Amino acid sequence: LREGVDLSMKLWPQQADNPNRSSQEGAWISAVNGVCGDHLESTGNALAIDMHFSTPEAILDLDAIAAAIPDASPHLVVFVHGLCLSPFSWRRRGARSVGDTLRESRGMTPVYLGYNTGRHISTNGRDLSEQLSSLCEAWPVPVESLSLVGHSMGGLVIRSACWYGEADGAPWLAPLRRVACQGTPHHGAALEKAGSLFDRAMQAVQYVDPLLLGKHRSVGIKDLRHGNLLDEDWAQAGEGD
């Protein structure tokens, strides 16, 4: 499976964070990152998504936020998407998003995180903490309140970021006021657990083992099995568990 992905990616020369990509292309790349993003990253594949912030219009350059968001509010809300999704997933078919509603009704400025969901949740959590510190420091006006909204895996990444942020004394925790999680598997994902049990059962059946695509799940997907948040969680269980 991963060799096939490598071959296919050679036919797609552009970078994962190319600002000229359509939402459909971005969705496809995000799905591939969710399935085997750890492999894309370890092999230096150009389609491995680097963590970044964006608006609905473009990826944010932290050195030019004032120009990109001239009406930035002191009340910042960051949206963190789930497995195999992208910042585009917060706005379905051009409909109004939650971010639009919060901007108009609460005077908040929405920012959307893009990241490789095939990586370990703890790795993304640690990186998110660092990125939030940089975002708050670069914000055009002093941040009075920070809100984080996570969907599915995004909620686990936020919780992981909070843990690592507290351990490091990260400055973004000072303005943090609220965290909202939507459909987050805090106690593990039942579907991923079922898939793991099915794989283990089928491994005992002759000739079936080579066909088990579940064996190729990314480490990000595997972390969902037990709701792993920290390095210690997946290290104790073992990479292959």
For each of these PLM feature ranges, what is it?
Residues 1-113, 123, 137-141, 191-200:
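Flexible, membrane-associating and regulatory peripheral segments of lipid-active enzymes
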Residues 19-33, 37, 163-241:
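Helical cap/lid subdomain of alpha/beta-hydrolase-fold lipid enzymes
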Residues 74-77, 145-147, 178:
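Structural motif
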Residues 82, 152, 183:
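Catalytic nucleophile serine of serine hydrolases
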Residues 107, 145, 173-176:
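A generic structural signal for alpha->beta connector loops
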Residues 116, 154, 185:
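Catalytic metal-binding/acid-base residues of hydrolase active sites
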Residues 119-139, 156:
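Alpha/beta-hydrolase active-site loop
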Residues 149-158:
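Gly/Ala-rich beta-loop-alpha elbow adjacent to hydrolase catalytic centers
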